[in-house]
From Swiss-Prot:
Keyword list, A-Z: Cytoplasm, Lipid biosynthesis, Lipid metabolism, Phospholipid biosynthesis, Phospholipid metabolism, Transferase
InterPro entries in UniProt: FA_synthesis, Phospholipid_synth_PlsX-like
Gene Ontology biological process terms in this record: fatty acid biosynthetic process; phospholipid biosynthetic process
E.C. designation(s): 2.3.1.274
Functional description taken from the UniProt entry: Catalyzes the reversible formation of acyl-phosphate (acyl-PO(4)) from acyl-[acyl-carrier-protein] (acyl-ACP). This enzyme utilizes acyl-ACP as fatty acyl donor, but not acyl-CoA.
Name of the featured protein: Phosphate acyltransferase
HAMAP family in alphabetical order: PlsX
Pathway the protein contributes to: Lipid metabolism; phospholipid metabolism
Gene giving rise to this polypeptide: plsX
Species, as recorded: Pseudomonas fluorescens (strain ATCC BAA-477 / NRRL B-23932 / Pf-5)
Origin organism lineage: Bacteria, Pseudomonadati, Pseudomonadota, Gammaproteobacteria, Pseudomonadales
One Pfam family it belongs to: FA_synthesis
A cellular component term, taken from the record's GO annotations: cytoplasm
Amino acid sequence: MSAQVIAIDAMGGDFGPRSIVQASIACLSATPSLHLTLVGQPSLLEELISGQTAVDRARLTITPASEVITMDEKPSQALRGKPDSSMRVALELLRDEKVQACVSAGNTGALMALSRYVLKTLPGIDRPAMVAAIPTQRGYCQLLDLGANVDCSAEHLLQFAVMGSVAAETLGIVRPRVALLNIGTEDIKGNQQVKLAASLLQQARGLNYIGFVEGDGLYRGEADVVVCDGFVGNILLKSSEGLATMIAARIEALFRQNLLSRAVGALALPLMRRLQADLAPARHNGASFLGLQGIVVKSHGSAGVQGFQSAIQRALIEIQEDLPRRLHGRLEDLLL
């Protein structure tokens, strides 16, 4: 297998580079064909690497960057004021084809602005969209947009639908069912942009559009791809993660109430751990920026070691599936 090379914005995220370095080294151990370059402050990164054991330095390099984009920094400031930020340098490595993907846990708005500026979008795409896999009763659903585009036109939603369909195809889904997230399934429901988007999706060649889906239908697995604007998608994603965490905590508390519940809990522990692992936000961490001329994966800023590993794994899959090239080909068929 040929090598996969990924640039890691090692300075992004809420907790600094420690967990990012640990996750990177863990991924190297698990994937012999993987090569990583950590982008950031060399002295700090070397110190963190030296504290780890069994590090294959032939597959782990450091690219220096003197500046860091903070989580509360405005995208315009990040774009114009920090030309040597770790985020920008990582994206420039991707643009210059020195790596095949970029992963960052940094400021979402800054990452989107820099990605569009440095990499540019694919022909036929006005705005990239963030997509992630959401667990459902039937498996997983690709949900987009997750916050990159708060206000969207009907044409943007059409572009998101096409990109989400291609992303689902790379995961082995044949003729993915595409739906628009709405407050009802009837044609009369929804705002004007959603209604206009429905008309466009119905006319799109080669797109398996099945109509509107409500929030509960998403979790029942009624669609493989669910499309919405970034305002709605981000709220849905964060609410889902919070709900999953709350349910797990409530069940754990119930099993600790008395001796009988503790005994029942001990019997149910293997199943509960499996369910908790399936629903854990860390397992599903990593939202792809679809529509760029390159692979960019956004990790949660609050992700720990396991969560950041998941983001790197998502980038690996997209490299192996050659997602930008496949996406470009499908966009030519459906949009151009």
